[in-house]
């Protein structure tokens, strides 16, 4: 009986470990997305620097530039006060990077698919907003004396073309 009980406990423990491993692998870490309005931007075509910082699943080589070409779509526009709007944007893209100690023939991919908000001022009612991006700058954050890092950083120049009613 004792042997059977220990065997059942061992099987249960293995099942719990497998379940936790599967859950952890499916979980994605949300990106930190910050939009900063550029100095001198106009109300009709505000220009933002969108910084996307994402923790990667595995450490990446800081000397290998990752590939990330995000696309942006407008999900909603809400009037939150006099001439004040809150725009919900969705960013979608795949980060392709070279893991440490792997070589350039071995790459990994990680998806970024997330909503974020940007405040917009408009004296007249907004009917639509069209996002457009400039040249994206990607990199792996370098930590002193380390050739690997799990922190991916992307700076995206984003212009919002605002159509008013």
Predicted feature locations:
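Viral structural modules
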Residues: 1-165
């Amino acid at each position: 009986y004792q042997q059977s009980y220990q065997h059942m406990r061992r099987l249960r423990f293995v099942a719990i470990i497998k379940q936790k491993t599967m859950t952890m692998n499916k979980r994605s870490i949300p990106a930190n997305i910050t939009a900063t309005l550029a100095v001198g931007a106009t109300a009709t075509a505000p220009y933002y620097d969108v910084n996307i910082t994402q923790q990667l699943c595995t450490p990446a080589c800081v000397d290998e530039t990752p590939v990330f070409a995000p696309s942006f779509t407008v999900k909603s526009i809400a009037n939150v006060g006099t001439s004040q709007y809150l725009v919900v944007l969705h960013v979608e893209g795949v980060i392709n990077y070279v893991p440490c100690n792997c070589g350039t023939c071995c790459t990994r991919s990680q998806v970024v698919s997330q909503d974020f908000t940007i405040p917009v001022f408009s004296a007249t009612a907004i009917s639509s907003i069209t996002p457009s991006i400039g040249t994206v700058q990607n990199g792996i954050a370098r930590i002193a004396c380390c050739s690997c890092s799990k922190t991916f950083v992307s700076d995206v120049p984003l212009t919002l073309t605002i159509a008013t009613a």
